[in-house]
Regions:
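Serine residues within intrinsically disordered or low-complexity segments
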Residues: 5-6, 26-29
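Short, positively charged and aromatic/hydrophobic N-terminal segments
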Residues: 21, 30-35, 39-44, 48-50
Length: 311
């Protein structure tokens, strides 16, 4: 409630024309002042709202690795999305079972707050995922696998700024998978997708191949990020034509490990010793990823930021 001034009009003026005029003038001056304050408040908040609406925040999360990685995703993902005002989230889940992913693990990642799951070279390690790949449009396998294999390599998803495409490709340097050239596959999927923002998870080993892909798609994709190597790189950037990029997101998995594996097992492997099946150590985990801020009008990336969350 707005209280007008309670000052009494001098007695000499209370019953004459001047007194009435003075009261009216006092009322209208306060009304105008309150109205101007209200207009200023509305303009300020409308401007801020428009600024917020012009930004679209995408969270990309690195390879979920083992049971510890799954726990970390379930523990931290929603809070991280809230902290960065994330409207859309893509998580690479190809190592959720250590190597590969099961339908139950995919459901757990989606329930934890992921909008889409991407995969990589371990897609087929758990054959029970094949039917799930056919049935769910919220999990993608690399688009440059053979077309006859189960699943899809890209999808279009509705967001608050309209449709956004997510694509998954796999590299060929030091990889035994991906029969189609990923650069040719990128051209094809961009043509099929049409004129909407495209987010690409490029699951590749070589830094040079990832960088080349990013520059190849600069101005054509909203963001390109690398996965697979499990080590977060410090080169997040926005390329000259407006594509957000980072060479590798890192992983979601054990902090004290070699790419998620017990250190002693990895050391034995490099020493040429006999090794047992890889195991994932207990202990604290780290969630790694990046947030890409897109301009909702142009679909271009305006900023890229690394994120990490420790248990």
């Amino acid at each position: 409630m707005i209280r007008l001034s309670s000052k009494a009009v001098p007695p000499i003026c209370q019953n004459d024309f001047f007194g009435v005029w003075l009261q009216c003038a006092s009322f209208f001056s306060q009304y105008i002042m309150v109205n101007e304050i209200w207009k200023w408040y509305n303009v300020k908040n409308t401007t801020k709202l428009r600024e917020l609406q012009m930004e679209f925040h995408v969270l990309a999360v690195g390879d979920v690795t083992g049971a510890g990685g799954l726990r970390s995703i379930k523990k931290h993902l929603r809070a991280l999305k809230k902290l960065y005002h994330v409207e859309f989230c893509v998580v690479n889940g190809e190592n959720a079972s250590g190597v590969g992913i099961t339908p139950q693990q995919a459901d757990e990642i989606l329930d934890a707050g992921a909008d889409v799951i991407t995969l990589g070279n371990h897609t087929w390690n758990r054959r029970e995922i094949c039917d799930y790949l056919e049935e769910s449009r919220y999990i993608l396998r690399p688009a440059n696998f053979l077309p006859s294999l189960p699943g899809r390599g890209w999808g279009v998803y509705e967001t608050q700024i309209g449709p956004v495409a997510v694509a998954n490709l796999i590299g060929r340097c030091n990889m035994n998978f991906g029969p189609d050239n990923p650069f040719h596959a990128a051209d094809k999927l961009l043509k099929d997708v049409g004129d909407i923002p495209v987010l690409l998870d490029f699951h590749a080993e070589a830094t040079s191949e990832k960088l080349a892909m990013a520059y190849y798609l600069d101005g054509r994709a909203a963001a390109v990020w690398g996965t697979h190597t499990h080590v977060q790189t410090a080169d997040e950037t926005v390329l000259p034509k407006g594509t957000g990029y980072i060479t590798d997101l890192g992983m979601v998995g054990p902090v004290y490990s070699v790419l998620g594996v017990k250190p002693e097992q990895s050391i034995a492997l490099f020493r040429g010793e006999l090794t047992s099946r890889f195991e994932w150590p207990a202990g604290p985990c780290r969630l790694c990823g990046a947030v890409f801020t897109l301009d909702s009008a142009s679909g271009k990336c305006t900023s890229a930021e690394r994120v990490t969350v420790d248990d």
